[in-house]
A protein has these predicted regions:
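Acidic, surface-exposed loops and disordered segments
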Residues: 1-298
Length: 298
């Protein structure tokens, strides 16, 4: 199964069976997590075979059952000068030689604490507000980009997945994850063997999700990228993103108003790159150029 097929196959599955995931598949996922951490600077961790990988915590949306396996998407707000939100290589803030990012944390070992004033996890009240801090925005987009990469890899391996936000994850008594100073759990990925098939997927029209210069026919590669982006997961299927093709062939993408919009944008950008072909995509650095992404006709 290639990535485009995995995008079509992927559905949000919130109920799982007790069938364990094969060890060979888990090893592949761990290797993919290590690669994502190395490229992105995130601190993604995985646990398997628990009675409840969500530790009894409430989820921000949806009811989950039988979640024995999960991936914690962990990071800290991106510092000035770091790579853009989809996490180019060279931003790793952790020493892979001195830690095992994908191992299950020992509950008997004290978890690193977070400095005063830094939240360890998103809370519902804060989640309903649009992120405005550039470092937080970059973190959310990066989590979306690399989290969706992992979700699609799991689908390729024959598993089902679903994104989830755990309310009050910082209050868990015996967390299997380890937070370094300043880090937070941004999202979770549940995965395993689904107990039931996924439902129908809905999407906005492509014309509402992208813009191209006046008088230009939409290039095939851009259309393919948009068709892939339209399959990306977003909270409540809101699709709060807008892609713009500029006259010079560069592409910009922005989060619109919506719940967890920047995480959804990261997912959509990963899909877009896969669909369009990474060799065809040149992202516009609007911050550096001082030009607005909305200038589709510039």
């Amino acid at each position: 199964m290639n990535l485009l097929e995995a995008m079509e196959q992927r559905h949000a599955i919130r109920a799982y069976t007790d069938e364990p995931v094969d060890q060979a598949i888990l090893d592949i996922l761990r290797a993919e997590i290590d690669a994502c951490n190395q490229e992105s600077g995130l601190h993604i961790q995985m646990t398997t075979g628990l009675d409840d990988a969500f530790l009894g915590l409430k989820t921000h949306y949806g009811r989950f059952t039988g979640v024995h396996n999960a991936i914690a998407l962990i990071g800290r707000p991106v510092r000035d000068g770091a790579a853009d939100g989809h996490g180019a290589a060279g931003t790793n803030e952790h020493d892979a030689a001195t830690e095992t990012a994908t191992g299950t944390a020992d509950p008997s070992v004290a978890v690193d604490t977070i400095p005063d004033g830094a939240a360890a996890a998103w809370h519902k009240a804060a989640a309903d507000e649009a992120a405005t801090d550039p470092g937080e925005i970059a973190l959310q987009e990066r989590v979306g980009y690399y989290g969706e990469r992992l979700a699609l890899r799991a689908v390729q391996l024959g598993l089902e997945t679903s994104w989830a936000v755990l309310d009050d994850a910082d209050a868990a008594e015996h967390p299997w994850w380890c937070l370094h100073p300043g880090e937070k759990i941004v999202w979770m990925l549940a995965f395993g063997h689904g107990a039931r098939p996924g439902g129908r997927r809905r999407s906005k029209p492509i014309e509402e999700l992208c813009r191209i210069p006046d008088g230009m026919a939409m290039p095939d590669w851009f259309r393919a990228g948009m068709e892939a982006a339209m399959l990306a997961p977003t909270s409540l299927s809101q699709q709060p993103f807008l892609f713009t093709l500029h006259k010079d062939g560069t592409v910009s993408a922005e989060a619109m108003e919506g719940l967890f919009a920047h995480v959804g944008l990261g997912c959509a950008k990963y899909h877009f790159e896969v669909g369009a072909g990474r060799e065809n995509v040149r992202w516009r650095d609007t911050a550096a150029s001082g030009e607005e992404a909305a200038g589709a006709t510039d």
